[in-house]
């Protein structure tokens, strides 16, 4: 979280102003480092030098676990590519392909608000609103979309999942039935595609004026 989380912005600003990253080591596997404790944890090791002088590059190495340091992969990456922007985001690239993708991303000079688009978090926290959840459609019910409905760039509904509908009059839990891009907020590191989106087309569900989204997805 400290490398990109919003709550850690002030920490990153102080930390990376007072010091500079020299070396980052990444563990590819999340379950091998603390395998005896059965902990699934993202783990990195960093070397920081207390200085205001920015280095030209950062060394990024990676290994599968803490038992195979003899099989490291190593990259030398421009510092401005790893630590970037006014938010001091730290980008943890592991191979040349990711470096090339990052170079292309850094060329983008517009944010979503700059082009008139907003991203919001799904409206319904399902476990806090159990009384409005429904397993099947009934009179007055509207669809509740989860991350599981996002499949291969599309939004599939229904999928015979529990609690796919809600019955509510709370305006804060409903949104207009119009076209959206749904984005999964959480994906596993082991998944082949970390950014997973689905196009929601309102014309596929003309019977609804309103829909709802679970808070583990974002929508644009």
For each feature predicted by the language model, list its residue ranges.
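Signature of N6-adenine DNA methyltransferases within the class I
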Residues: 1-117
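Polybasic, glycine- and aromatic-enriched phosphate-binding surface used to engage nucleic acids
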Residues: 100-220
């Amino acid at each position: 979280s400290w490398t990109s989380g919003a709550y850690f912005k002030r920490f990153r600003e102080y930390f990376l102003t007072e010091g500079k990253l020299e070396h980052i080591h990444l563990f590819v596997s999340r379950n091998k480092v603390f395998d005896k404790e059965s902990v699934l944890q993202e783990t990195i090791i960093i070397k920081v030098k207390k200085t205001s002088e920015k280095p030209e590059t950062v060394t990024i190495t990676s290994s599968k676990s803490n038992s195979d340091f003899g099989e490291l992969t190593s990259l030398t990456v421009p510092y401005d590519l790893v630590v970037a922007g006014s938010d001091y985001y730290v980008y943890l690239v592991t191979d040349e392909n990711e470096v090339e993708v990052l170079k292309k991303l850094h060329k983008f000079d517009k944010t979503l608000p700059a082009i008139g688009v907003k991203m919001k978090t799904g409206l319904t926290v399902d476990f806090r609103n159990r009384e409005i959840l429904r397993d099947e459609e009934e009179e007055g019910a509207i669809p509740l979309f989860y991350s599981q409905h996002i499949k291969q760039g599309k939004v599939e509904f229904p999928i015979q999942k529990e609690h796919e509908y809600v019955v509510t009059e709370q305006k804060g839990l409903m949104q207009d039935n119009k076209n959206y891009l749904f984005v999964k907020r959480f994906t596993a590191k082991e998944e082949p595609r970390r950014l997973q989106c689905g196009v929601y087309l309102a014309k596929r569900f003309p019977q609804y004026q309103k829909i709802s989204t679970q808070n583990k997805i974002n929508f644009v």
